[in-house]
Amino acid sequence: MGLPTLEFSDSYLDSPDFRERLQCHEIELERTNKFIKELLKDGSLLIGALRNLSMAVQKFSQSLQDFQFECIGDAETDDEISIAQSLKEFARLLIAVEEERRRLIQNANDVLIAPLEKFRKEQIGAAKADSQIGREHQNFYEASLEYVFKIQEVQEKKKFEFVEPLLSFLQGLFTFYHEGYELAQEFAPYKQQLQFNLQNTRNNFESTRQEVERLMQRMKSANQDYRPPSQWTMEGYLYVQEKRPLGFTWTKHYCTYDKGSKMFTMSVSDVKASGKMNGLVTGSPEMFKLKSCIRRKTDSIDKRFCFDIEVVERHGIITLQAFSEANRKLWLEAMDGKEPIYTLPAIISKKEEMYLNEAGFNFVRKCIQAVEMRGITILGLYRIGGVNSKVQKLMNTTFSPKSPPDMDIDIELWDNKTITSGLKNYLRCLAEPLMTYKLHKDFIIAVKSDDQNYRVEAVHALVHKLPEKNREMLDILIKHLLKVSLHSQQNLMTISNLGVIFGPTLMRAQEETVAAMMNIKFQNIVVEILIEHYEKIFHTAPDPNIPLPQPQSRSGSRRTRAICLSTGSRKPRGRYTPCLAEPDSDSYSSSPDSTPMGSIESLSSHSSEQNSTTKSTACQPREKSGGIPWITTPSSSNGQKSQGLWTTSPESSSREDATKTDVESDCQSVASITIPGNVSPPIDLVKKGPYGLSGLKRSSASSSLRSISAAEGNKSYSGSIQSLTSIGSKESPKAIPNPELPPKMCRRLRLDTASSNGYQRPGSVVAAKAQLFENAGSPKPVSSGRQAQAMYSCKAEHSHELSFPQGAIFSNVHPSVEPGWLKATYEGRTGLVPENYVVFL
């Protein structure tokens, strides 16, 4: 029930009813006054809490900003660099949100506190002061009229002067929340890419951990005196008997022995309570040439595990004491002592070795033939192992001395898992790995290079340095793995997954150490490069001018060229976002990012909930030298025929793999997903936003992006593409027509530098969202030496580009090594022009 009205005529009568109605208004104003006081108090507490929260978040952000990741090994993968930089990205994002919160707090006093306080004091207070009118007898009627007018005025002004400040404060609060929403939208692509990096790193960690754990268990179960091979035939601590005036003393020495030169070295290494270096006292090493070694008779000395040696430089014998009987046997064996030569414990002895002979080649070919004939689309091919007893039976049957070299494999007798496990077991048990110990370090150094192009060229050259049989076997195997990867839509065995499985098998380290285990991730990359660049590596001669890999120190500059969030001023959103960095800056070119292993469910939460409207682009597939041409594979769901499925060229790499001179174009990361009821056209995954996927320059044709399909029932996606594309919308996507002026589809990559993760922003906290556009023309091959006309004008952003007006005529137009760009001549000057800016005449 509302307040009764106050009539001016009633004020002259001053009736009891008028007094009662007037009192109702005064009581309401008093209640409003108390409420505003409480509201101001609570508002001050809210602002104080926001200020404390802001300070806490800023301190948290600073902690994230200051922390520095360090990784094991002398080089880092792009995944590790991205993950190491992620904390700084989180810090920048939080700082951007806190900047908006700071503005909210600064304006809160002017928007909320001051207006309400002013209204309470000036309006309600004035009405309360007028309540003294009862005591005034002079000019009673005139004052009464003014009082009634004031009461009415305050009651009406309360409706807007009281609520308006609250609305302004809430508007500011919602502006802050909207800013957080925009930042979350902007952060989503980076978050997805970081999830890819994390999943990829986790898979690498799992494979590395298994190898390290296996090595640790072998060391635990083996005799503690087992020592991996090194530059010395034998080394370790021994006690040396030294004569003293009153008897003998035993001094601990660190001794080494080289069997080839027969040089024996002793370095004093004894612990003194008052010595320096934490009690460790070391002396200069003494070197001797060994003459003979003999075991000391047990009853001739009161010490155990002793043996005597004679050296050229000293007269008499030197008595040494080992730590155990097994350790003494190893020393005697190394020095050709008069003890029998004992072998290493059986548990660490090598498995039965295989060889690259006729039987081995036949076995590999038969296994591959069986897999390709009946099981190349089986889910988890090569990842899921067979039963050990069956695998061992297959190996014993095939490689038995009585078996002929060309023995057939009965595919009815052996299941697919047993055959694939047998193939891996054969390669794993070779006396020397297929890539050889000699070239192992060279391959590792090659893929540690920051230069993506050099990686491929160096691996190409090193493969041709392999022995003929090794290269022939590698050719057979990699050709098969390429076929397997082309069916990753069904078997989920992407190039990245195959690299994880066959990397340690083909590039087994000679020394089983933790340091060698840390290089497993680079072994995987070598295999990925071999698969993706199969045609070039095995069917073309390497460039003789490519220098062989040289050992290099860990680069400290790679991490500085990482993802960055600018804190510049806000700019309005445009339809298309232009270049995100200066042409000469490191951030202008994007380095390869890695893509994760194939997983059906991982990172798929964004696939079906984003973008009810899809903007798309069609890029021109091109067949490049050393690569596999783009193919279109029909796929269907429940009998419903779907659109052709674009698959990316294996020439682009999946993790840190280098591209050739023809660096993969952004537009080659096009993929199409078919869902019953709605079909989306190919989508350009390149988002030129602050967290856009421009960092996928090379990983655009990642093995994980090789193929995508969506089943009607569960909408499961092969590979890990699902969280990258976000296409599976619940509503039917609609294509947006071509804009008048398309942006340059493919930013040129500078081949002389390799920046890290290329997520740039054009100077704003909430940058312009990535734009996708549709190319109505069908893909046409680019011919050499033709004329072309410019459809749009263009201003050069780099010294190697051409500036030209609309309608300009180009001559001698032919493809360039830059993806998405053509080389042309205009007005006597030759340079690069965007491929989608011109039409051939």
Swiss-Prot record:
Domain of life: Eukaryota
Annotated ranges, domain PH: 231-340
GO terms, molecular function: GTPase activator activity
Modified-residue entries (Phosphotyrosine), positions: 342, 837
UniProt cross-references to SMART domains, sorted A to Z: PH, RhoGAP, SH3
Annotated GO CC locations: cytoplasm
Modified residues (Phosphoserine): 649, 707, 720, 723, 778
One GO term (biological process): negative regulation of systemic arterial blood pressure
Coiled coil: 191-227
TM helices/strands, residue ranges: none
This protein's name: Rho GTPase-activating protein 42
